[in-house]
């Protein structure tokens, strides 16, 4: 079950076999997993029985500014869900500022560009959010971030390849990133 808000996260912990978080921010993963785990415990379940999947854009390369621009669409997509959370819980409610602060500059969102690199409706998304929500940088940067996520309890990582380096990124995952992660700590 995927979710961002406290109610959806608690429901996930109570009944779901798995939790999908559509962003790769370690802080927000920890925050989300607290709700999932607390609800699982309250329901008499082992919180570790709820498998965790992080799904986010991955872009391997050395030009971070270009990667930010290519993956900024994702912050806009997440921003749509965050806007709903702010409407429900308030700007300074249960949802951390690390998730809500950036949408203050959000204006109208045109779904005609949804999920596409270069989406003009996502200009409000700062580089910092793109970097936190996605997995960007060199092969070594990807390995480091994925290791952090794994240490926090992520069982599976799903990459989105909606940018101009699909083949290169996929090749890097197949040839370098996945083998390095498997060598460090086989599952």
Please report, for each region that a protein language model flagged, where it lies by residue.
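Structural motif
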Residues: 14-15, 152-154
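Glycine-rich, proline-tolerant flexible connector loops at the mouths of alpha/beta enzymes
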Residues: 23-26, 158-171
């Amino acid at each position: 079950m995927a979710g961002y808000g406290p109610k959806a996260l608690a429901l996930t912990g109570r009944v779901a076999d798995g939790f999908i978080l559509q962003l790769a921010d370690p802080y927000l993963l920890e925050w989300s997993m607290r709700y999932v785990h607390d609800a699982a415990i309250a329901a008499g379940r082992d919180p570790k029985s709820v498998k965790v999947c992080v799904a986010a854009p991955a872009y391997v390369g050395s030009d971070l500014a270009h990667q930010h621009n290519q993956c900024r669409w994702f912050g806009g997509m997440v921003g749509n869900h965050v806007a709903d959370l702010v409407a429900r819980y308030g700007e300074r409610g249960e949802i951390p500022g690390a998730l809500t602060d950036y949408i203050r500059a959000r204006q109208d969102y045109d779904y005609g560009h949804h999920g596409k690199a270069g989406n003009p409706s996502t200009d409000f998304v700062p580089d910092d959010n793109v970097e936190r929500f996605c997995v960007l940088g060199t092969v070594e940067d990807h390995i480091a971030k994925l290791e952090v996520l794994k240490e926090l309890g992520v069982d599976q990582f799903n990459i989105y390849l909606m940018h101009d380096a699909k083949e290169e990124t996929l090749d890097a995952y197949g040839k370098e990133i996945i083998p390095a992660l498997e060598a460090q700590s086989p599952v």
